[in-house]
Amino acid sequence: MAVVSKTTMIGELLQIDQNVAPLLLNIGMHCLGCPSSQMETIEEAAMVHGINPDALVDEINDFLAKDQA
């Protein structure tokens, strides 16, 4: 099972599991296809969108654990 951190790049996250995209879109991260977002960390993206990065990482890791089980 993959585990991500605040320093994981959005592009890397989407390579780990593309099924995480709807989770990100539902919280307002609509720029997943933007070239610049691919080089942004989860923490940077969370901060731009006013989201707690630690909570987001926990939510993503919970999702990955279930999706990749």
Positions of PLM-derived features:
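Domain-level signature for proteins that mediate thiol-based redox and metal-cofactor handling
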Residues: 1-69
